[in-house]
Design a protein with these regions (language model features):
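Long, charged, low-complexity intrinsically disordered regions
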Residues: 1-82
Length: 82
């Protein structure tokens, strides 16, 4: 995988399924990948959003997290644009 931003839809996934998906993306993300954009929705509760924040805020590959203004998307920044 080499695009700059990888987008994945986590709608309907459990936290376990989301973790498997995101961990696989983090393993496969190449050096040209800047962000992982994780779409989890804000209308079905905050379980996935909270899980992503708790689990990946201190992950060694993640520089920082960005939560969208509407709360439906979390972006994991793997490296900054230069």
């Amino acid at each position: 995988m080499s695009p700059g931003v990888i987008t994945v839809d986590l709608h309907g996934k459990t936290t376990y399924q989301a973790r498997i998906t995101v961990d696989a993306l983090l393993r496969r993300a190449g050096s040209s990948t800047y962000w992982l954009r994780l779409i989890h929705s804000c209308h079905a509760g905050t379980a996935l959003r909270d899980f992503l924040e708790r689990t990946y805020a201190r992950h060694p590959r993640v520089k920082r997290l960005i939560l969208s203004p509407d709360g439906g998307t979390t972006e994991l920044v793997l490296r900054e644009y230069v």
